[in-house]
Swiss-Prot record:
Lineage of the organism: Bacteria, Pseudomonadati, Pseudomonadota, Gammaproteobacteria, Vibrionales
Role: Involved in chromosome condensation, segregation and cell cycle progression. May participate in facilitating chromosome segregation by condensation DNA from both sides of a centrally located replisome during cell division. Not required for mini-F plasmid partitioning. Probably acts via its interaction with MukB and MukE. Overexpression results in anucleate cells. It has a calcium binding activity.
GO MF entries: calcium ion binding
Chief localization: cytoplasm
Family matches, as InterPro entries: Chromosome_partition_MukF, MukF_C, MukF_C_sf, MukF_M, MukF_M_sp, MukF_WHTH, WH-like_DNA-bd_sf, WH_DNA-bd_sf
Species of origin: Vibrio parahaemolyticus serotype O3:K6 (strain RIMD 2210633)
Keyword Repressor: no
Protein name: Chromosome partition protein MukF
Pfam families: KicB (PF03882), MukF_C (PF17193), MukF_M (PF17192)
Keyword Lipid biosynthesis among UniProt keywords: no
Self-association and partners: Interacts, and probably forms a ternary complex, with MukE and MukB via its C-terminal region. The complex formation is stimulated by calcium or magnesium. It is required for an interaction between MukE and MukB.
Length: 445
C-alpha cells in the first residue's frame, strides 16, 4: 500500500466522498481523448521545460485525429473543446504568460502524469529495471543506517533517517510494487495470446504456446532470484536500524516507518513466489488441455501427421526430445517420532518414546477445551501463551516439532478474525532460547 493510500485510509470515507463531491472531481477519457493525452505527454517529455503552447496542442490533436478519422476532422473548434475538457478534468493546467503576449501555455497535472506514465513507461517489466531499483533502495538504506548510527537530535532523526525511509525508500518500494502489477498484466496478456492460439488451430499452436509458457516462466524465475538476493540484504538493514532505535520512546515514529517498510518488503518478496506458483498451475492446465485435445481428436490429425513425419524422416530429418526423469520416492511417515537428540539432563520416559499421534491427540484435547471455554465465555486464545506454557514442560530439542504440531492443531480448531482484516500481529517469545511466534489471538470457534 502506498503512503498516499495509507494517509487516505486514516480519513473517514464520508469525509473523502464529501471532498470529491465538493471539488466536482470526475474522469471521462474515451480512447481518442486518452490517445490525445498520451501524445501531449510524449511532446512534453521532448521539451526542456515540459511546457506546450496552444499551437502544439492543436498539432498533437491533428495527429491523433488522423488515426481516428471516423470521429471527424481536426478542426480548431474540436481541438479547443478537447483542450478545455482536459483542463476541466484537471489533466492539464493552463497558464497565461505575459512573455508570450497573453498566449496560453500548458503543463500536465500530477494526475495526467500518473495516467500517461502507466501507458508510456510501464509497458515492460524487466529484470534490469528491478535490479536498478533494488540497488537504489540498498543505497538509500545504507544512508539511513549511517545516519542512525551517528545519532543526534530529533531533527537529525526526522530529516536524515525518517525522511529517507519514508520519502525515498518507501517510494521506490511503491514503484517496485507498481511494476509487479504491470507484470501481472503481462501474464494476463500472455494467457490471452495462448487462448487465441488454441482457439484458432491448436495443432499449429502447440509450439507457440510452449514458447510463450517457457519464456514467461523463465522471466518470473529470474525476477524472483533477483528479488530474493536483494531482500535478504534489505531485511538485514531494516533489522539494524530497528536494533538502534529499539526501546527509545522518542524514536517511535522511526519504528512505525520501519514497520511499514517491512510490510512492503514482505509483499514484494512474496509476490515473486506466488506468481511462479500460479504460473506453474496455469502451465499444467494448458498442457492438460492440449493432451485432452489430442486424445479427443476425432480425425486423428495429430497422429496422422506424426506417422507422415516418420515416413518422411530421411527426406526431412527431425529431432525428438523427450523427458525421462526418475520417479521421486515419498519418504514421509504418517507417524513421525519426535527428535531423539542427546540432551543434558534426564528426559522423562513418557516424552522420550512419545509418538506423533499421542502428542497430537493431547494437544487437540487441550486446545479443544480452550476453544470450548472461548465459546461459552468469549475468552480469546493467545497461541503464544499456549506455546510458552506447553514448551516449558519439554526439552529444548523437542520445541520445534511440538510448536509445529500446536500451530497445526490451532488452525484446524479455530481462527482469528484479525487474519481476515489483514492485521499483522507482533512477534512474541515462546521459550527462553529466542524462539518467537507471530499469531493473532484465536477468537472464532
Amino acid at each position: 500500500m502506498s503512503e498516499m493510500t495509507l494517509n487516505a485510509a486514516e480519513q473517514p470515507i464520508d469525509e473523502l466522498v464529501g471532498w470529491v463531491k465538493q471539488h466536482d472531481f470526475s474522469l471521462n477519457l474515451t480512447t481518442e481523448r486518452l490517445a490525445f493525452l498520451i501524445a501531449i505527454a510524449v511532446l512534453s517529455n521532448e521539451r526542456f521545460d515540459e511546457e506546450l503552447g496552444e499551437g502544439e496542442l492543436h498539432d498533437a490533436f491533428a495527429i491523433v485525429t488522423r488515426l481516428f478519422d471516423e470521429t471527424g476532422e481536426a478542426s480548431a473548434f474540436r481541438a479547443n473543446n478537447a483542450i478545455n475538457e482536459m483542463v476541466k478534468q484537471r489533466l492539464i493546467s493552463r497558464f497565461v504568460s505575459e512573455i508570450t503576449d497573453g498566449a496560453s501555455i500548458y503543463r500536465l497535472s500530477p494526475l495526467a502524469i500518473g495516467i500517461t506514465d502507466y501507458y508510456v513507461r510501464h509497458r515492460e517489466f524487466s529484470r534490469l529495471r528491478l535490479s536498478i531499483q533494488l540497488s537504489m533502495v540498498a543505497d538509500e538504506m545504507a544512508k539511513a543506517i549511517e545516519a542512525a548510527q551517528k545519532g543526534g537530535t530529533p531533527g537529525h532523526w526526522k530529516k536524515n533517517v525518517y525522511g529517507v525511509l519514508k520519502y525515498s525508500v518507501g517510494e521506490i518500494f511503491d514503484q517496485i510494487d507498481l511494476n509487479q502489477r504491470v507484470m501481472d498484466e503481462q501474464q494476463q496478456s500472455v494467457k490471452q495470446q495462448i487462448a487465441d492460439l488454441l482457439n484458432k488451430d491448436w495443432r499449429e499452436a502447440i509450439n507457440n504456446c510452449e514458447a510463450l509458457l517457457s519464456e514467461t516462466s523463465s522471466t518470473l524465475r529470474e525476477l524472483q532470484d533477483t528479488l530474493q538476493a536483494a531482500s535478504d540484504e534489505l531485511q538485514t538493514q531494516i533489522l539494524d536500524i530497528q536494533e538502534i532505535v529499539y526501546g527509545d520512546p522518542e524514536l517511535e515514529f522511526i519504528e512505525e516507518a520501519l514497520f511499514g517498510l517491512q510490510m512492503k518488503l514482505d509483499r514484494i518478496t512474496s509476490w515473486g513466489q506466488q506468481a511462479i506458483d500460479l504460473w506453474i498451475g496455469y502451465d499444467r492446465h494448458v498442457h492438460k488441455f492440449i493432451r485432452t485435445a489430442i486424445d479427443m481428436d476425432k480425425n486423428r490429425a495429430f497422429s496422422s501427421r506424426l506417422r507422415q513425419s516418420i515416413k518422411d524422416y530421411f527426406d526431412m530429418p527431425w529431432y525428438l526430445t523427450f523427458a525421462d526423469a526418475e520417479r521421486l520416492s515419498d519418504l514421509r511417515d504418517e507417524a513421525l517420532v519426535l527428535r531423539d537428540d542427546e540432551v543434558t539432563g534426564q528426559v522423562p520416559m513418557e516424552v522420550e518414546y512419545e509418538e506423533f499421534q499421542q502428542v497430537n491427540d493431547e494437544l487437540s484435547e487441550r486446545i479443544g477445551d480452550m476453544l470450548k471455554a472461548h465459546k461459552e465465555q468469549g475468552t480469546p486464545i493467545d497461541l503464544s501463551v499456549v506455546l510458552r506454557d506447553y514448551l516449558a514442560q519439554h526439552p529444548y530439542t523437542h520445541h520445534f516439532d511440538l510448536a509445529r504440531i500446536i500451530v497445526d492443531q490451532a488452525v484446524r480448531l479455530g481462527y482469528s478474525e484479525s487474519d481476515y482484516q489483514a492485521i499483522q500481529p507482533d512477534w512474541k517469545a515462546i521459550n527462553e532460547f529466542g524462539a518467537k511466534v507471530q499469531a493473532n489471538v484465536i477468537d472464532r470457534y
